[in-house]
UniProtKB/Swiss-Prot annotation:
Family (UniProt): Belongs to the WD repeat WDR5/wds family.
Keyword Repeat: yes
Region (Disordered): 1-25
Motif (DDB1-binding motif): 186-190
Signal sequence bounds: none
Lineage: Eukaryota, Metazoa, Chordata, Craniata, Vertebrata
Function text: May function as a substrate receptor for CUL4-DDB1 ubiquitin E3 ligase complex.
PANTHER family, A to Z: WD REPEAT-CONTAINING PROTEIN 5B (PTHR22847:SF516), WD40 REPEAT PROTEIN (PTHR22847)
Organism field: Mus musculus (Mouse)
Name of the protein: WD repeat-containing protein 5B
Length: 328
């Protein structure tokens, strides 16, 4: 019966009646591109903040810059002497920093493809790196168990934080650059004041499983951690409380990159040691999609800054990057 034929009171009650909640929509990521160019295991993939490019690093000591939409190889950056574990973009997408087993970081100019600075000071493999939002500072983490803060302009180390008692697995600045989070094989996740270098808080899990990845949420209020017991957790770090736990994937050996997808609905995205990409609903913790196609461990998964696009990369038996897109 059409609403307009009902008595006014009845029609109004129908219009204002609370609706049953709709089923949460799920993503429908499908494979769009497969990018091949590295000759060894890929370690990291990152979209540029302007969304135009995708940077990949690998055990072949190379960085390749790809077109984010067409998958074409734009540039190859040469300079490191040993494998590269991580890359990170400056906020304006004009520069890139890389972390290598040769114990150095390199800052690259995107336009020319040339190395602008080599940052020396770590005494062991440099495993992770990040620019702060103004892109005047770089943070790095190393197997020497320290976190270092560098000045981009001069290439000088400004601070060395005796951060952990085991290798550092991940470092990340928050959205305004005031905080740094570090994760380590010692099982601790630490939040630092970027200006003073003071440790503000330490997060630890029961049993202290090695922390293999850490990242601030886009709004800076939460931290996503991965541990080598097949678990991702979302923390309210100001209270030291774990809010959400995401499981179902496999992660016991490698430091797998995870990411927040916020361009459509809100997902958590991670690689997995069963050769798949896993996508969880951020709120419900439900696995909403698994992306199949890689033939080795998916070490890295990155989300495009403005579109529903995921890039994933895999280890030695695969050596490819796959680009996936979804309607939501």
């Amino acid at each position: 019966m059409a609403t307009e034929h009902l008595p006014a009171e009845r029609a109004q009650s129908l219009l204002s009646a609370p609706r049953r909640e709709e089923e949460p929509q799920k993503p429908n990521y499908a494979l769009r591109l497969t990018l091949a160019g590295h000759s060894a295991a890929i370690s990291s993939v990152k979209f540029s903040p302007n969304g135009e490019w995708l940077a990949s690093s690998a055990a072949d000591a190379l960085i390749i810059i790809w077109g984010a939409y067409d998958g074409n190889c734009k540039k190859t950056l040469y300079g490191h002497s040993l494998e590269i574990s991580d890359v990170a973009w400056s906020s304006d997408s004009s520069r890139l920093v890389s972390a290598s087993d040769d114990k150095t970081l390199k800052v690259w100019d995107m336009r020319s493809g040339k190395c602008l600075k080599t940052l020396k000071g770590h005494s062991d493999f440099v495993f992770c790196c990040d620019f702060n939002p103004p892109s005047n500072l770089i943070v790095s983490g190393s197997f020497d168990e320290s976190v270092k803060i560098w000045e981009v302009k001069t290439g000088k180390c400004l601070k060395t934080l005796s951060a952990h008692s085991d290798p550092i697995s991940a470092v990340n600045f928050n959205c305004n650059g005031s905080l740094i989070v570090s994760g380590s094989y010692d099982g601790l996740c630490r939040i630092w004041d970027a200006a003073s270098g003071q440790c503000l808080r330490t997060l630890a899990d029961e049993g202290n499983p090695p922390v293999s990845f850490v990242k601030f949420s886009p709004n800076g209020k939460y931290i996503l951690t991965a541990t080598l017991d097949n678990t991702l957790k979302l923390w309210d770090y100001s209270r030291g409380r774990c809010l959400k736990t995401y499981t179902g994937h496999k992660n016991e050996k490698y430091c797998l990159f995870a990411s927040f997808s916020v361009t459509g609905r809100k997902w958590v995205v991670s690689g997995s040691e069963d050769n798949m990409v896993y996508i969880w609903n951020l709120q419900t913790k439900e696995i909403v999609q698994r992306l199949q196609g890689h033939t080795d461990v998916v070490i890295s998964a990155a989300c495009h800054p403005t579109k529903n696009i995921i890039a994933s990369a895999a280890l030695e038996n695969d050596k490819t990057i796959k680009v996936w897109s979804s309607d939501c």
